[in-house]
Amino acid sequence: SMTAAKLQHIPQLVRQQYVAAIEAGDAFFFESDVRIVRGQNVQRPVPWQIRIVPALLKKPKAPVSAEEEVRPKQNQVDVFAPPYVPNLLVKELDDFTVLLNKYCVLPHHYLLVTRDFVSQEKPPSPSMLALVYSMITSHTPSSDGAELLGFFNCGPNSGASQPHCHFQLVELTPSENATKAVPIEHMLDTQSAPDEDKEEILGLAVPWRHFVARLEPPSDPEKLENYFGKRFSHLLEAMFSLALEKNDENKGL
């Protein structure tokens, strides 16, 4: 298993590589605005944060110069497979690689990708979940209180633009007028009592199916993989059982 000491250096490496990649033109940052939107006619509305990125409407294409022609290029068949662009490569781990995201809406946006090709339409493996959890818990919040958020878009319908398995990690700070960096935490605070059964899967009161598993992982890193495999399977069971109950052709999504 990956030691916490090795993982603690990743945010620092990400920052160094990010500066180098932006300066070299191997990564791109797009300015954005955040709007806070609160639900109408609901108790305790969640302050949803909607990020608007006008530049993504039309990504500019610069004319190809002689310098561009010799620039290291991503693998055209699979951008998350070797050979990696040196400025986008943060760290190679055993079965995974840490890469910078080429197109950033938030600074220091990076990815954990499988070394070998695995489809993004498959759920993340227990080993990947355990590693992401370890990366998040070994992350030291910066002076502005930024927290590390990991998210996984499972296939094109949920926003994944690449077919190679990847988990995304970003640093988030609470937006103006918001007390939490992750809006859904407001619902967790109001929907779960401290003494509730920690094994229970929570279904959140939103207009889509959203299930939450609270975590109390074992302190032994060797047992993390098994723990996350079980908790994730409980989430999937909750999703599919509700889909069956509703006779849902979309499998609960």
What spans do the regions from the language model cover?
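Active-site microenvironments that recognize anionic phosphate/pyrophosphate groups
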Residues: 1-124, 174, 178-229, 233-253
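Short, well-ordered alpha-helical segments in soluble proteins
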Residues: 78-80, 136-143, 171, 191
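Histidine-centered divalent-metal-coordination microenvironment in nucleic-acid enzymes
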Residues: 151-179
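Generic beta-strand structural signal
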Residues: 94-96, 108-109, 146-150, 161-167
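Short N-terminal edge-element motif at the start of the domain
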Residues: 108-149
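Solvent-exposed loop and beta-edge segments used for protein-protein assembly and interaction
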Residues: 42-44, 144, 161
